[in-house]
Amino acid sequence: MNSTKRLKMSTTFHDYDLEEPLTSNARPLKNSVITIRVIKSFPYRNVKNIVLHDYDLADKTAKDLFNDVLNKIQNEGSFRPFRNVKFDTLKIYTHAHGSKTVNLVINFDHDDDWTLDIENDKKKLFEYGIENETEISLFNKEDYLRFKENPEEKW
């Protein structure tokens, strides 16, 4: 084996730059990627994601987001089983690069400050602290409160 080959094998290369900004800060607010976790059933952990690309967090409101997601659920065939749920709540599940909750379905913390007001057509999404790569849960609030009282999983 020649010395050049040995040198390459023994050297560790990093494929990232510590000075590079986090992806949550690198994309503009008008060109963000957010994930919506559509929750059909809490006990059975029935969740399906919608990934919204190039979403405008600077101009869109929680009401706009709610309507956009409901429209996708109604028009995409893969969401047919989710159409019988009366969705009425959007809540931040996790912020980009933040720690995730122990519960795989929903974040039980921050009910007051991470729940979005879907009736407010003035407050923009970025004003809720939503940025690129934020995950948001969509669910029925009554089902959530019932599951929060007794978080028993059935599968």
Curated annotation (Swiss-Prot):
InterPro entries: UPF0538. The modification Phosphoserine is found at residue 78. Pfam families: DUF2340. The keyword Transferase does not apply. It is found in: Cytoplasm. Keywords: Cytoplasm, Phosphoprotein. Present with 1230 molecules/cell in log phase SD medium. May be involved in mitochondrial organization and biogenesis. PANTHER family: UPF0538 FAMILY MEMBER, UPF0538 PROTEIN C2ORF76. Belongs to the UPF0538 family. This is Altered inheritance rate of mitochondria protein 29. It comes from Saccharomyces cerevisiae (strain ATCC 204508 / S288c). The lineage of its organism: Eukaryota, Fungi, Dikarya, Ascomycota, Saccharomycotina.
